[in-house]
Amino acid sequence: MVYIIAGATGVVGSAISKELAKENEVHLIGRDEEKLSSLSKEIDAQYSLIDLTKTIEQREFSKIIPDDKEIKGLVNCIGSILIKPLHGTKTEEFEEVLRVNLFSSYYLLSSFARRMKNGSAIFFSSVAGTKGLSNHE
């Protein structure tokens, strides 16, 4: 059984990866190969360099875990923040926020959910939503 941690090189993702790796097999996903390589060596984990906002990789990333390996859990720590008034936000910036925060979650869950038997998926969100930051996307 394996746990998949997406956004594994961020503060939250790396802490979760380290804790889960103490007693479980983990597979790290991220966009920074240097950080992924370092973390994978530290906790003895496999990793995949994947940018879930890129179309070509979205179709392929579900193949990173062999079909005969059960996925016990999926942890999504991918996220970004754009603090800017709407009237000053370019369409490209808004689309990037959607790719990072929304579409990557969809790609992860749609690719791995059917392979999880009695597994769990955990998605982290921003504390900014509970604090009511002005000019927050």
Write out the residue ranges for each language-model feature.
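Conserved glycine-rich Rossmann-like NAD(P)H-binding loop of the short-chain dehydrogenase/reductase
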Residues: 24-37
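Substrate-binding pocket helix/loop in short-chain dehydrogenase/reductase
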Residues: 85-86, 93-98
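Conserved NAD(P)H cofactor-binding loop of Rossmann-fold oxidoreductase domains
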Residues: 77-83
